[in-house]
């Protein structure tokens, strides 16, 4: 049968189109205005000015940002002496990674239900002009002053549509104030999306020094094991981890009758260490794709797992993902801002920044 040349060309173009569609997913996009972030950060846009002018900077309805606990400014403002920094924009390109506990009807039952969306992971990835990568985590319980509302509160409470800007813009304004770092781009993922990404990689390796668990949400044996997305998520967000005390014991019905005790030292900071370890472990999995098809499966999983800002194109986002393969993950600086524990008068546990962010990075030789 004679095949029409034009038909061959058409089929070729169609195949290329299908191939490109599969490679470049349809990420959810969100507006992100760096100029608005600057205005919020400087205090030029606040809830007071909005009430005075009647101006609205966001069409989104306010949502529950998590902890509504507000601390008395005159009592706690003296604790924020390190919450400002020189600008360091010229040193890095910065990416803000926000992990939220937003649930949907498809979310794992072990995580329960919750209204609204809280910033459970706040991670800044900084890339200098030598392509050296540093990861800086900000604990969710860090005490800050919100430049929009002027409330003194935990930093995760600033991830909300409070009238000044979007959730990401408001959080970026807080970060600009306490770090001197302008966020260039952000990416946001939910619990469900996080699980989906890990499952698309056929699991991720987690190594622990002790057999540990939290209720029925996870149990990890001492050593290294490859786990699915649900178990990995439950592990990094766990606040009530227990460790095995002695030998693992089962009764005649196979029920666990072992002795378990609370893990000592569990805190927001230990959760951050787990988050960083897991993210690097994920990056290493990306670095070791066995085939292009496995890469396609991973990229396709991102379609409903991430939200990215509108200032970065889908093509650029895909290139960034592919370029992760070139990173020497052993040389990534994993940092957590130095903090101290503080208990408020009503018994709330918060963290206080112990060192100015500029001085902190200087001490790590990252501003040379």
Locate the predicted segments by residue.
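Non-catalytic, solvent-exposed segments at the cell envelope interface
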Residues: 4-7, 11-12, 18-368
């Amino acid at each position: 049968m004679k095949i029409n040349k034009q038909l061959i060309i058409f089929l070729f173009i169609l195949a290329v189109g299908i191939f490109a569609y599969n490679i470049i997913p349809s990420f959810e996009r969100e507006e992100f205005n760096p100029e608005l972030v600057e205005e919020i950060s400087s205090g030029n846009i606040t809830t007071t000015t909005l009430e005075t002018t009647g101006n609205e900077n966001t069409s989104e309805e306010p949502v529950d940002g998590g902890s509504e606990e507000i601390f008395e400014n005159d009592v706690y403002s003296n604790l924020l002496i390190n919450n400002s920094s020189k600008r360091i924009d010229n040193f890095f390109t910065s990416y803000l990674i926000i992990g939220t506990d937003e649930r949907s009807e498809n979310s794992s039952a072990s995580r329960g239900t919750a209204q609204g969306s809280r910033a459970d992971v706040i991670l800044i990835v900084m890339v200098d002009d030598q392509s050296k990568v540093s990861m800086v985590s900000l604990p969710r319980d860090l005490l800050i002053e919100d430049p929009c509302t002027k409330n003194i509160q935990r930093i995760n409470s600033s991830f909300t549509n409070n009238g000044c800007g979007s959730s990401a813009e408001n959080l970026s304004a807080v970060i600009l104030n306490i770090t001197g770092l302008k966020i260039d781009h952000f990416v946001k993922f939910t619990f469900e999306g996080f699980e989906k990404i890990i499952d698309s990689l056929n699991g991720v390796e987690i190594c622990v020094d002790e057999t540990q668990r939290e209720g029925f949400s996870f149990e990890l044996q001492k050593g290294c094991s490859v786990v699915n997305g649900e178990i990995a998520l439950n592990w990094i967000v766990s606040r009530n981890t227990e460790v095995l005390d002695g030998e693992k014991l089962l009764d005649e019905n196979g029920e666990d009758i072992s002795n378990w005790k609370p893990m000592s030292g569990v805190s927001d900071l230990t959760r951050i260490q787990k988050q960083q370890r897991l993210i690097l472990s994920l990056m290493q999995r990306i670095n070791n794709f066995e085939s292009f098809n496995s890469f396609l499966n991973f990229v396709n999983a991102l379609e409903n797992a991430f939200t990215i800002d509108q200032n970065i194109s889908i093509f650029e986002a895909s290139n960034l993902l592919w370029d992760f393969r070139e990173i020497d993950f052993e040389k990534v600086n994993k940092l957590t801002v130095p903090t101290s524990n503080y208990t408020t008068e009503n018994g709330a546990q918060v963290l206080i920044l112990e060192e100015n962010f500029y001085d902190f990075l200087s001490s790590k030789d990252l501003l040379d």
